[in-house]
A protein has these predicted regions:
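Conserved G1/Walker A P-loop phosphate-binding module
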Residues: 1-84, 88-111
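C-terminal-of-GTPase-core extension/linker across diverse P-loop GTPases
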Residues: 2-7, 12, 18, 146-353, ...
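Short, glycine/charged-enriched secondary-structure capping and boundary segments
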Residues: 21, 83-86, 115-118, 216-220, ...
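Short, intrinsically disordered, mixed-charge
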Residues: 23, 56, 92, 96, ...
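Glycine-rich, flexible loop/turn motifs
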Residues: 25-33, 40-42, 50-53, 82, ...
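Amphipathic alpha-helical transducer elements in NTP-driven molecular machines
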Residues: 34, 48-51, 64-70, 84-98, ...
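Conserved Switch II/interswitch segment of TRAFAC-class P-loop GTPases
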Residues: 42-47, 74-84, 95-156, 170-183, ...
């Protein structure tokens, strides 16, 4: 399951956004599995209209969406890398996530105090990035110290230390671990450290309701920072998300349209996260259930089958495949088969976004 950590300075709207996302997901997907793990962590169902359309087509008894766990990570202040505030707890929590959603205040409001006295997206981003970088630098230095003796006789330790030396140089220059070009083997050496600046980052520009559709100068300022870092950005409004909670689901689309946007913050954030991490969705559908499955882009049909069960991958023979839109156009699997639209794909097939698949296997 994808796990995203939501970080940000105090009073940027981080917790408001988290609470709204989790509450909206629960309201939007009342018939989907949902749970709150603890007050600062919630598993939400990924909104996907294709899932409901396929379930209707198949008269499915159950709908099972993919899920994302959002973690509201508290305690990040200047000096967190030295344990200030809830720094140590913050760092332990964030090391476990797949991606970091960095909420940055991009709205003016005299009633909401800014910790630095004024709104400054680039400055705020730098504060958090500095803390992440300092925490990583400390961890890399400690690891290299432990490797000293091993590196005298172990080629593996020498290889790891060589990678860490390059990462340390980047961190000392104020950069991020993700900026260091690594081979697949070298990346595996780094993975156990859970370096914070190696994780993909999305900047969520938290704007007022009036700026949700078009953004503002603060958004442009942060977009320039993100471009320089190779990070993603998504515009979001904690204020709007909180208002959505109070509306009946049937009225939400009209409310968002009135603001000039087509989707709420949860959809925008998940879409951006999937794109950043290179994730794809495929479906299985039938009378028993219609289900969405998350895979990495580039996965072959057997690998995608293995996400369901390892036996499916081990004994893979072929996959009956059709695109979601084509299946919906046909009206049923039987009609699609009669039209010759169902494809038998083999072991080399790369699964496409939105494929509907049925696997034939033998173990």
């Amino acid at each position: 399951m994808l796990k995203a950590g939501i970080v940000g300075l105090p009073n940027v709207g981080k917790s408001t956004l988290f609470n709204a996302l989790v509450a909206n997901a629960q309201a939007e997907a009342a018939n989907y599995p949902f749970c709150t793990i603890e007050p600062n962590s919630g598993i939400v169902s990924v909104p996907d209209p294709r899932l409901n359309q396929l379930a209707t087509l198949s008269s499915s008894k159950e709908i099972i969406p993919t899920k994302v766990e959002f973690v509201d990570i508290a305690g990040l202040v200047k000096g967190a890398s030295q344990g200030e505030g809830l720094g140590n707890k913050f760092l332990a929590n964030i090391r476990e996530v797949d991606a970091i959603v960095h909420v940055v205040r991009c709205f003016e409001n005299d009633d909401v105090i800014h910790v630095s006295g004024s709104v400054g997206p680039a400055r705020d981003a730098e504060v958090i990035n500095l803390e992440l970088g300092l925490a990583d630098l400390s961890q890399v230095e400690k690891r290299r110290e432990r490797l000293k003796k091993q590196a005298r006789t172990s080629k593996e330790a020498q290889a790891e230390d060589g990678v860490l030396e390059r990462v340390q140089a980047e961190l000392e220059a104020g950069g991020a671990a993700r900026n260091v070009a690594l081979s697949a083997e070298e990346a595996l050496l780094l993975k156990p450290l859970g370096l914070l600046t190696a994780k993909p980052i999305i900047y969520a520009t938290n704007v007022s309701e009036d700026d949700l559709a078009g953004g503002n100068a603060y958004c442009q300022e942060l977009a320039a920072v993100a471009k320089q870092e190779g990070a993603a950005t998504v515009r979001i409004s904690a204020q709007v998300e909180a208002e959505l909670i109070e509306l009946p689901e049937a009225d939400r689309a009209e409310f968002l349209a009135g603001l000039g946007v087509e989707e709420g913050g949860l959809q925008s954030l998940i879409r951006a996260t999937y794109a950043l991490l290179g994730l794809r969705t495929y479906f299985t559908t039938g009378e028993k259930e219609t289900r969405a499955w998350t895979i990495q882009a580039g996965m072959t049909a057997p690998q995608a089958a293995g996400v369901i069960h390892t036996d499916f991958e081990r004994g893979f023979i072929r996959a009956q495949t059709i695109g979601t839109q084509q299946l919906l156009e046909a009206g049923s699997l039987a009609a699609a088969r009669n039209k010759g639209w169902l494809r038998a794909e083999g072991k080399e097939y790369i699964v496409a976004e939105g494929d509907v698949m049925e696997f034939l296997f033998n173990v």
